[in-house]
Structure formats: C-alpha cells, structure tokens
Amino acid sequence: MAVASVLLALFMLFLSIVTVIGNLAVLLSYYLDKNIRQPTNYFIFSLAISDLLIGLEGIPVYTAFYLNNNEWIWGDVLCDLWLSIDYIVCLASIYTVLGITVDRYYSVKKPATYRNWRTPGRVVLIIIFIWLVPSILFSVSIFGYGTFTGTGRILKETECYVQFMTNPYLNMGMYISYYWTTLFVMLYLYWGIYRAAKKLALKSDQKTKRLALLTEMRRPEVSVRTSDAGNSSSDSPNDTSNSSKCFRTAPPTTTVQTTQTNVGTPPPVFRNHMTLHNNNMDFTKDNEIVRPPTPPDDNTYSNPNFSMISEQLTNGFSRQEPSSVIERESTAPCVSPEPSHASLENEFNENHHAHFKPELSLPFIDADSVSSMVGHDDLRRAMSIRISRSVSMQGTARATPVIEIVENLEEALKICENLEELREDENKNEEEKQKNGLENGGMNHVIIANDEQQPSTSKESEQKEEMTPENHDPNEVKVPLIAVSRVESVKSTAGGKVRRLITQMRSHSIRSKRKANKNKSVLSALNFFQRKKEYKSRSENRARKALRTITFILGSFIILWTPFYVLATIYGFCETCKASPSFNTLYTISYYLCYMNSPLNPFCYAMANQQFKKTLTRIFKGDFRRV
C-alpha cells in the first residue's frame, strides 16, 4: 500500500508539473507571437489559465487529501476555499469550451458578419462573464449553503466536500443546469460545424470539377458533330479551294510486288489534336475522298498486312440516322499506315526519290468520346478505324490505302498494335530503303461505313507524333491531313443511307499555334488553380480548422468530464454508495479524469492549430524571441 501511494504521489506530481509547464507555455506563446494574439484565441488563453490553476491547486491538494484516507486536516475555511476555487475553475473550463465552440460555429456559419462583430473588447467581456458566473454560483453555494438552508455546517471536521451534494435534487439540478445542458448545446454546435465544413468541402470539390471541365474544354481538340438525317450528297460540294490545308511531309516510296502471307503488323497509331469545323471536302460518287496521287511505277506492292483487312470492306453500311446534335471535345489519334516489312528491302527503284512514305492520317473517335456520345438509340453506334489496302495484281496497278470507319473498337485496337510493330520493323530497314524515285500513281481513298456492332471500351494509344516544319527535303511530298469535322447521313447512289465524314484541311501552322495556345491555357489554368487554393485556404480551411480544434478540445472534454458528473449524480441518490469502497474508488478516478483534461489541452491546441504548434515548439527549444 505504501508503494502504491508513493507511485501515485509521484505520478500526480509529474502530472501537475506537466500541466503547469504546458499551460505556461501556452500563455507565453501569446506574448511571443503576435499572430496568436487574435480575438478568437482569447478563449484558449482563458482555458489555459483555468488549466494552470488546476495544475497548481487542484491536482496536488486532492492527491494529498486522497492519500490521507480522504481526511481533511487543514480546517473548514481552507476546505471551502479549495472547493470553491476547484469548482469555479472547472465550471470556467466548461464555459470556456462552450465559448470556443460558439466562436468556431459562427466563424463558419456567418464568417463576415461575425468577424465584424467579434472585436477584442467584446471577446474580453464574454470571458469575464464566463469567469463571473461560476465564481458567484459556487462561492454562494459552498460558503453560504448552511446559511441559506438554516442547517449550518453539516460536515465533520475531517470531511471536505460540497454540502449541496447531500441534497440529491439540488445536486442533480445544478449538474443539469451547468454541465448536461452545456454539453448538449456544444454537441449541437459541433454538429453544425461539421455540416458546414462538409458542405464547404463539397462545394469546393464541385467548383474544382467544373474548373477542370472548363479547362478541358478550352483545349484545342477534336469536336465531332452529328446532324439530323435527310442530308443528301449535295450537301458537301466538291470544293476545297477555301479550305486551309494541313500537310504532313512524307518521303517518297514505291510499290513492289510481294507474296501474300499471313496478316502482319500495321503501322503505329498517333494522336492528333485538332479543332474541326464544317468545311467541305472533295468526295467521289462512291463516297471516296480523293488524295493526291503519287507518281506511277512499274512495280506493284502487295502487302499481306493490308490485303486481308481489305476483305472486310464488304461490311454493310449503317442505315441509322442521327437525331440530335452532340459536340464532344477529345484528343483523337491519327492513323498513319506505313508499309514496312523485311521482305520489302528491294521495293524501291534506284531512280526514285528516297524517304517517300505517304502517310495517311485520319483522326478517329476514341473510346471515351464514344461512351460520352451514347444518349439515344440512333447515337449508340461509335466508330473505330480499320485500315486496308486494295492491291491490284496487274502490272502497273497502284496501291490504294483505304480507311473504313467501323464500330468494333477491339479490332481497331488490335490493328493499331500491329501498326506499331510494322513501324518498328520499318525503322530497322530504313537505311536499306534509301532509294531515289517516286511511286507510280497511288490514289488515296477514304471509304466510310458502319457496322451494326456496338463499341466496346478499350484503351487508346498513348503515343503522339509532333511534326516539325523545319525538316524540309526537296524530294519530300506533302500529304494533306484529313480532319473529321462532321458526321452526317447521306444517300448513296444505290438509294441506301450511309454515314459520311465531311472533312477539311487544316494547316500545320494553325496546329502549331494551337499547341502554343494549349500550353498557354494550361499555364493559365495552373494560375487559376493556385488562386483557387488560396481561396480555399481562406474559406474551406477555416471550417476545417474549426472542426479540428473542436474535435480535439470537445472530444477530450466529453471523455474526461462526463464520468464524474454521472457518478456525482448517483452519489446524491444512493445512500449505500457512500459507504461502498468500490464506488468511492470509481468516484476518485472520475475526479482525477477531470484533472487529466488540463495537461492534455495544450497538446490539443498544438494538434489543432499550426501556429500554436510552431510557437510551442520554438518555446520548448529555448527560443523566446518575440515576433
């Protein structure tokens, strides 16, 4: 028993020292840091004073009284004085926590109005009222209880506790009035702070998403429109004189005859950024877009990679008519078929120019764009790209690259992967293909068709190709880039309806300018995000900081103070509990728990407020400079 008493005394002494030092550091931080000397922190200053007094008189005196077998040996006056100070400080702590909760609540709910109202003088008056009410209440009830009741002092000489505890109804009424009512008010305010903080956070997230969407829409990307059906083929006249042209430089190549093998790997897929308009493009009567021809050659080129794919051109055209207009901005890749294979090393004629590889580029709608377009039955069909090259087995036939718009994204992705493998093989054999001359003929066609299959989600190619206008070659041939501007239903020569792409030419300089504008818009968006972050720190962070402060302070307050008031209420109604050692032990523990809140509060400030944390850390390191 003696060892336990010594250990308890040492622990309580340590707890008292920690309480005094911690709260003195909080008070000192007000003197050292002007940023802490704000009206909202006056309540924390008041709470630190009450905790300091508990560390000076509450913990050591009650420990001595408990170790002396709950016998008071210092007289009645000191007993009443100690009880008065102890209860006044404890109730002042309760009301101070209530003041902190109310202050944080109005700081979040009505920030502008409350900040104008919350002047230093008014906050000081509130703190004075917080201390004045407990002082009057407990001074009168403790010192004057015998006088008001007419019974005089009813305690023995060795007893020391408040006399109104002997009246269970008065005792319970006082506890309900100044603790339980206050506790429920604080919980209600805490719930209001939580809802306000959550609402501000949700509003901030919605603004951020809208900002991201606007930033995405500002980028120069592909916009695909679907117009109403009923348009005929005369809606797009064969006139491209007013269209600006976007050329991709490609070195010459020739066509040679090869044996047909299994399907190889098509060329890679590149991503192309363009904003499209409803300009016109030359169409043939068979809905073919005529590309610039290449010079004829005696040899013919038959690539098995494209021959097998060309057999798939027999797919039926879609007869579905769009019924609404949808605009979508997304990044669409370009398909650039480049024939390359190990067996093509002799495909060039020595009289031809070197590096001629006509690249056919057609942006297509990616999977994300397709998924966003699905809104009606007539719009649920999306497009992907299938490439084939029609090969003539005649002596002077020319290779005709064909692009078919289909709706099977999985097959298109597989073809795109094969394109990448052919691209790698072509790079390996590039030195062997350094021949002079131009290819004979080579009319480029684009045939548009739709299958009845629905698109399936797939990953889009992540590769990009940036064309630089600086690398010019006299032998280079400029091949125009085809940019999709509108998808509409037209009537074919057979009377059926097919979907046709109205295309236009865009110049490379315009694309370069758009790239620069894109970078500029990204920088502007970053600046806007930075300003958004600053605004967020002034509004949403205020609510989050208030919620964090109240969570630590109010949470520790409820956990540590509630047990005492529960047992104290029972103590007034239970006569047998007073003589029960186990109940008295629980009562003593609950009393100590109330004291335990005082050394924890400084750490709660540090965890809830970064400015307090910085200043307290500086104080404990021995830095007492005033800033």
From Swiss-Prot:
The reply on keyword Cell membrane is yes
Question: What is the membrane topology listed in the Swiss-Prot or TrEMBL record?
Answer: Multi-pass membrane protein
Q: Do you know which CDD domains this protein is assigned to? A: 7tmA_mAChR_GAR-2-like (cd15302)
- List the PROSITE patterns hit by this protein, alphabetically: G_PROTEIN_RECEP_F1_1, G_PROTEIN_RECEP_F1_2
GO biological process, alphabetically ordered: adenylate cyclase-inhibiting G protein-coupled acetylcholine receptor signaling pathway; chemical synaptic transmission; G protein-coupled receptor signaling pathway; G protein-coupled receptor signaling pathway, coupled to cyclic nucleotide second messenger; negative regulation of synaptic transmission, cholinergic; response to xenobiotic stimulus
Q: Where is the composition biased (Basic and acidic residues)?
A: 459-475
Give the Cytoplasmic membrane side ranges. Answer: 31-41, 103-122, 194-549, 610-627
Q: Per the record, where are the segments of Low complexity compositional bias? A: 231-264
Membrane-spanning parts? 10-30, 42-62, 82-102, 123-143, 173-193, 550-570, 587-609
Region Disordered, residue ranges:
222-266, 423-442, 449-475
Disulfide bond annotation, renumbered to this chain: 79-160
Which SUPFAM superfamilies does the protein's record reference? Family A G protein-coupled receptor-like
Q: In which tissues is it expressed?
A: Expressed in putative sensory neurons, many cells of the ventral cord and in the HSN motor neurons. Expressed in some cholinergic motor neurons and GABAergic motor neurons, which are the two major types of ventral cord motor neurons.
InterPro entries the UniProt entry points to: GPCR_Rhodpsn (IPR000276), GPCR_Rhodpsn_7TM (IPR017452), Musac_Ach_rcpt (IPR000995)
Function text: The muscarinic acetylcholine receptor mediates various cellular responses, including inhibition of adenylate cyclase, breakdown of phosphoinositides and modulation of potassium channels through the action of G proteins. Primary transducing effect is Pi turnover. Regulates the activity of ventral cord motor neurons. Couples to the G(o)-alpha G-protein subunit goa-1 to negatively regulate cholinergic receptor activity in the presence of high levels of the neurotransmitter acetylcholine in ventral cord motor neurons.
Homology family: Belongs to the G-protein coupled receptor 1 family. Muscarinic acetylcholine receptor subfamily.
Q: What is this protein called?
A: Muscarinic acetylcholine receptor gar-2
* Species for this entry: Caenorhabditis elegans
Source taxonomy: Eukaryota, Metazoa, Ecdysozoa, Nematoda, Chromadorea
